[in-house]
Amino acid sequence: MASKKAGGSTKNGRDSQSKRLGVKRFGGEKVLPGTIIVRQRGTKFHLGNNVKMGRDYTIYSVVEGLVKFERFSKERFKVSVYPKAV
């Protein structure tokens, strides 16, 4: 017969893994085509020039250039990539 009392179970101890969302390339940074600029859930940032959106709302560059975040209403931003002037 066991002489050790059974330990109680806990209802805590679960958490989801972080999804590493957020801005990956900031304003003024140089990017290449295909570079991820923002990972997000929903459209926290909207599309500007020379960027596209993936099916998970990831915004990425389609040209080589510099990233620019532009405010287009009181609390909304759009992300653009402008080619460097030659």
UniProtKB/Swiss-Prot annotation:
PROSITE patterns: RIBOSOMAL_L27. InterPro entries: Ribosomal_bL27, Ribosomal_bL27_CS. GO terms for molecular function: structural constituent of ribosome. One of its GO terms (biological process) is translation. The keyword Acyltransferase does not apply. Disulfide bonds: none annotated. Keywords: Ribonucleoprotein, Ribosomal protein. Residues 1-26 are annotated as: Disordered. One of its GO terms (cellular component) is ribonucleoprotein complex. Belongs to the bacterial ribosomal protein bL27 family. This is Large ribosomal subunit protein bL27. It comes from Bdellovibrio bacteriovorus (strain ATCC 15356 / DSM 50701 / NCIMB 9529 / HD100).
